[in-house]
Regions:
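Acidic, surface-exposed loops and disordered segments
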Residues: 1-157
Length: 157
């Protein structure tokens, strides 16, 4: 197993059977990231060590945790994602950088206890907030985006 499981998240962070083209896009992002870091595919320990930096918020001075009411469904989770995107855009407008980190969701009991989350709340994600170091190779990585026609279809326009 290459991915840590922690205590086990309360939701599937990724689909259990990630299929093409999503699997391919995820793989490409991972390869680009580790190439920038100089960590070859075969260096499992190096990749695990880098992944562990998530749990130090990559050295960011500020962290944000987000939880969701357990009674909410996919529409509200979508709303929450849009709200987080707006938070990230507002941070950027103020000169701050951010990194959403769903990896925190694999420690729901530990983080939930630390945050004193009520039983009806579920840990959704964490976020690093600070200033990117543009001298570091990963802080300048821009991942490839799929063409709009591959991800959306506009009918009647």
């Amino acid at each position: 197993q290459d991915e840590p499981t922690g205590e086990g998240s309360e939701y599937d962070i990724s689909p259990r059977e990630l299929v093409a083209p999503y699997r391919d896009r995820r793989f490409a992002v991972g390869e680009a990231m580790y190439a920038r870091l100089g960590i070859p595919r075969e260096d499992k320990a190096g990749r695990r060590d880098w992944f562990a930096r998530n749990y130090q918020f990559f050295g960011a001075p500020l962290a944000l945790f987000c939880s969701v009411d357990r009674r909410m469904g996919p529409p509200q989770w979508s709303d929450l994602g849009m709200m987080l995107q707006n938070v990230m855009l507002l941070l950027r407008a103020e000169g701050l950088d951010s990194c959403a980190q769903e990896c925190w969701a694999i420690y729901p009991r530990t983080i939930g206890a630390f945050l004193e989350l009520p039983a009806e709340r579920m840990l959704f994600t964490g976020m690093s907030i600070g200033h990117a170091n543009r001298d570091k190779p990963l802080d300048t990585l821009v991942t490839e985006r799929a063409p709009l026609a591959e991800v959306a279809e506009f009918i009647g326009i």
